[in-house]
Amino acid sequence: MSLAIVHTRAALGVNAPPITIEVHISNGLPGLTMVGLPETTVKEARDRVRSAIINSGYEFPAKKITINLAPADLPKEGGRYDLPIAVALLAASEQLTASNLEAYELVGELALTGALRGVPGAISSATEAIRAGRNIIVATENAAEVGLISKEGCFIADHLQTVCAFLEGKHALERPLAQDMASPTATADLRDVIGQEQGKRGLEITAAGGHNLLLIGPPGTGKTMLASRLSGILPPLSNEEALESAAILSLVNADTVQKRWQQRPFRSPHHSASLTAMVGGGAIPAPGEISLAHNGILFLDELPEFERRTLDALREPIESGQIHLSRTRAKITYPARFQLIAAMNPSPTGHYQGNHNRCTPEQTLRYLNRLSGPFLDRFDLSLEIPLPPPGILSQHASKGESSATVKKRVIAAHERQYRRQKKLNARLEGREIQKYCVLHHDDARWLEDTLVHLGLSIRAWQRLLKVARTIADIELADQISRQHLQEAVSYRAIDRLLIHLQKLLA
């Protein structure tokens, strides 16, 4: 036949919309025309496919060839269309006799020798193909990724000849091996942190409720050390969460997908990171750090050193759990539900009081003004991590609880929240807060007076209630008490610091 149709998948974010490759061969001047909004990388496929077909022992048709990538309104880039184009060409030129092409989807880049190479986004393509009721053939390089989904419906191949022999029924293809869960890497333990008991308590509350945390203190007090221990007290990812995170990671770095399977992402971008690097972007938008941290932790060290517009761009994703990227050629939505952990010094010199302070209150306030009020409002807890008291380093005091012990309480708190409301406390919204964060009348009035004194917003009031609810869950209490509220209010270090500086300037 002179017309052949082969199915494949595009890669638009974590989605993999279906693409139909239509190849028509007719009489006329030899040449190849490709239509359907192909990018430069796709147009280059004509040369790769020609060499791959010839070096695989087939003939490249010396006729007029028209290739259509439908639908035409979807942008298409990368070498993922090489394999389906080559198979469609061979079928249209009657060098490949396969009657069951409709049952398969093909995704893979071709080398000039005909060898198959892996492509980004194989997890999304395989998931969507299986959901559509088709089998999918991918390169052996993608075997570890698709093996995370299911070996049913997936085939792996290493050469164009192998794929053609399989489609003709002459050769069997291997299925990807089901990937075993990678053994968890050794994480740093909370017992390594000397002192800072309030910081450890705040870290436990952060993990138990899925809250955002801001650590404030002089240099060298253990802020970064505490933040790096958070992943060690969080429960492992569920299979569904792990697949979501793996699908995003496979778009940028497929080699590490299997190694980090079911480990919560921990992203720590440098403070020089641009807006595009943080939220994602490009002509066809690629995921940024906030999407790569989906279901995990985004740690921002030296917070005031980030560009203000970069930090303010995080405000909407923190609330919605996703980021919408609109460009001329594509509009893509990436998931971005992460826990934001940040660390900062209270002043340019690292200290705002005591013998080490070399800044005036005006300089300190100007430094803190790099962070907008609405952005600081997104933190559920802000903790001061002070210098250790004299003698603590020389004393052989108890090192406190291990990460494993704290992790058990965190998992118990998670289970309690999911039984009660099907989500973590940090994700509670308006009416849910009214339903699950009920206060006694006297406690509600006390909290309102405290908010007025600290000058906090309605959003901060809601976040205080959610933190208090988490503290109650850790204590296995059904009702939020005054003690829980007082502890939640104690984790507002940034507000107390600003009030202190304003009093000095008054």
Curated annotation (Swiss-Prot):
InterPro entries: AAA+_ATPase, CHLI-like, Mg_chelat-rel, Mg_chelat-rel_C, Mg_chelatse_chII-like_cat_dom, P-loop_NTPase, Ribosomal_Su5_D2-typ_SF, Ribsml_uS5_D2-typ_fold_subgr. It comes from the Bacteria. Signal peptide: none annotated. Gene3D superfamilies: 3.30.230.10, P-loop containing nucleotide triphosphate hydrolases. SMART domains: AAA. One of its GO terms (molecular function) is ATP binding. Belongs to the Mg-chelatase subunits D/I family. ComM subfamily. This is Uncharacterized protein YifB. It comes from Salmonella typhimurium (strain LT2 / SGSC1412 / ATCC 700720).
